[in-house]
C-alpha cells in the first residue's frame, strides 16, 4: 500500500456461490484477509455472517497482460518498478450454505458487482450456485465475473468439462457472456486474471453525492475488549454501505427504525436512535468523510450494548428528519419465479396466498410478514418488524418449503 494514500474503496463486490467452493479462500488471495473471523464459523468451517475485506488493484505498465495486475504494489518484471494503484475494492463474502440464504440476500443489497465462485471438482450447478445467481438477478446485479476455482485438484479433462457445465448453466441468465476465469485460490494461481476481469467487467458505478446521505447497516459491533477500563471505552460501531450522499465526522445522524422497546401491556414499539459520528473507517484507513463505495464503519456515541452482536443490522442511517417513515405494511408489485431454486428436486412456485407467511429481504433488513391481500400482480404484507424503504425499491420474496426459506420471486415497493 502506498503510504499516505487514503482513498476509500470505490466499489462493493460480492463473492457468492455454493458452500465449500472456496469463496473465503478467494477473498484471502485477493486481499490477504481471512473473513471467517467468528469462533462458530471457524469451528464449523463455514461463513455464517457476512465477511468483509478491503483489497487493492495495482497495475504495472511494464508488465504483460494479465500479470500487470496484482493485489499488492509489487511487480513481476522488476522489484524496483513502481506499480500504480488503480482502485480500492470492498469484498462482501456471502455464506453459501442453504440455511443462511437470508444473510446472502442482505449482503446482495450492498453489491455493485459479483464474483460467482464455482468449484471445478463438483458438477455445476450446485443448489446454492443456482440460488445465488437467481438472487443476483433479483437484486439487479448485472456485472458478474465467474471464478472457476479448484482447477488444481482436477484433471485437464475435468476442468474443460466443468467449463462447459458453467457455460450451459449461465445460458439465458443475467450472467450469460460473463468471463469465466480458471483459478486456484489456495495456490493464488491466476489471481492476476481475476483482477484484470474485475477492472474490465465491474466498473465503479456513478454516485449521487448531492442527495441526503443514506447508509444500509449490515453489521454492528461493540469494539471494546472485555476488561477495558471505563475511561477507555468507546461508543458502538455500525458498518455497512453508503447508498447516496456524504457522511462526515461530527454529523448528527438518525438510525431508523431503531430498537424494539416493550411497553406496558406487552406492546412493542420501535424507537429511533440519534447520535453523532465520532469516526469513519474503511478497513485500516481512517477518513474525515465517507461517500458511496466500499464498506464503512461508523463510530458513534451510542452505548455499545445497543450495537453489539449485530443488533442494528437492517436499520438505515441518515440525517435527522430526512429518512422516510418506517413502514409496517408494504404494497408490492410482485413477480414469481417459475421454479423454486436452491432445492435438488425441482418444484413449481405456487401463487402467493392470503394469510401465508413470507420472508422479505428489503435492503439489508430481513423481516417476516403475513400476506393480507393477494392479487395477480400485487400483494400487501403486514410486517413483524418495520422497515425503512423507498418506492420502487426491490424486495426478494422467500417462502418456507420443506423446513427452509426458499426464494420464490421478487417485487417492487409501491
From Swiss-Prot:
Gene3D superfamilies noted in UniProt? P-loop containing nucleotide triphosphate hydrolases, Translation factors
For the region G5, give the residue spans.
Answer: 184-186
User: What EC number(s) are associated with this protein in UniProt?
Assistant: 3.6.5.3
User: GO cellular component terms?
Assistant: cytosol
SUPFAM superfamilies for this protein = EF-Tu/eEF-1alpha/eIF2-gamma C-terminal domain (SSF50465), P-loop containing nucleoside triphosphate hydrolases (SSF52540), Translation proteins (SSF50447)
Q: Where is this region: G4?
A: 149-152
Domain (tr-type G): give its ranges: 8-206
Q: Which residues bind GTP?
A: 20-25, 149-152, 184-186
For this entry, the protein name equals Translation initiation factor 2 subunit gamma
